[in-house]
Amino acid sequence: RHGLLIIEDNAQAIGATEHGRATGALGDAAAFSFYPTKNIGALGDAGAVTTSDSSLASAVRALANYGSDRRYHNIYEGFNCRMDEMQAAMLRVKLRHMEEECLIRENTAHVYSSTICHKAVITPTVSPGMRHVWHQYVVRVKDRDSFRRYLQEQGVPTDVHYAVPPHM
């Protein structure tokens, strides 16, 4: 209606599905992060954009190549965001094990959810028809800092991923 594109942030959801449809295939394009801490991590910074729109693909490819659509011809103010061969080779190997890794995280999350039985701890839920790939297992509590101290005393590491939301 307004000519807007839907671009999915699929940085932490590779392997997730909504009613059988893979995340990353729901919009006009999707951005994937392969930072080492992600579900499928490269050796260093890496990422990808997927789309079935050939003109959008050409624009993204040019932006990632200094804004150039061909050698020494810049059509945009771009960046150097090309993935090198070592990152691609590592990801190619890891991709073969993605489903196995997703199942391990799903099983671990199930163990957490079925054994954390305290009224002060709200565990995550998954809606019917959804497949969660558990990049993180996040719980909600009233006093985060006290809870983190308690877990630390029990030898359980925790982290606050975004102490200040990125948009703030």
Regions found by a protein language model. Give the residues of each.
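Short clusters of hydrophobic/aromatic residues that line enzyme substrate/ligand-binding pockets
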Residues: I14, T23, I40, F79, ...
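Glycine-rich phosphate-binding loop of ATP-grasp-fold ATP-dependent ligases
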Residues: N39, L43-A48
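Catalytic PLP-binding core of fold-type I/II PLP enzymes
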Residues: R1-G20, D53
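PLP-dependent aminotransferase class I/II
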Residues: T17, S52-M168
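Proline-centered loop/turn at the N-terminus of a beta-strand
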Residues: G3-L5, A22, A29, P157
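Short aromatic/hydrophobic contact patches that present stacked aromatics
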Residues: A31, A48, Q136-V138
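Short Gly/Pro-enriched turn/cap motifs at secondary-structure boundaries
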Residues: G24, T37-N39, S127-G129
